[in-house]
Amino acid sequence: MNTSFNPQRQSYIKYDDSHYLLFLNEQAAEQEDEFSGKISGYTYTGTMPDGSTLIEATGVTAENMRGKFIAGLICIEYTNDDQIALLANGEDTNEHAEELAKFKEVRAAAKKAVDDLLSRAKNQQIKRAIFPQNH
């Protein structure tokens, strides 16, 4: 994982036709600048050098963005085939029950991360609408 400082708050960026960069694990931070002293900003931790996380997501719209981003994060850990197998197996054995519990934890973490990210993005859009000269 990579952690990177950014003086501007980030949320997500369309990378190409089938990928997005999600800026997750946001933490308020300060960094020393040799010219102007301390700079306030944020750190992000992810798989990419800039602290973002690259996910696969196609056909993203405002209406389906949450689901697409959650699915993209889950697919980093589990392929679609793995997910189908986990859900089909259910809890029929102790091993399957443990695997399903772990999957549910990953899914819950992905949902929380995306909800935090989309809340941040919405707040940024509101600020831009209210204070367009500052953004």
Question: For each predicted feature, which ranges?
Answer:
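A preference for well-ordered globular domain cores
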Residues: N2-H135
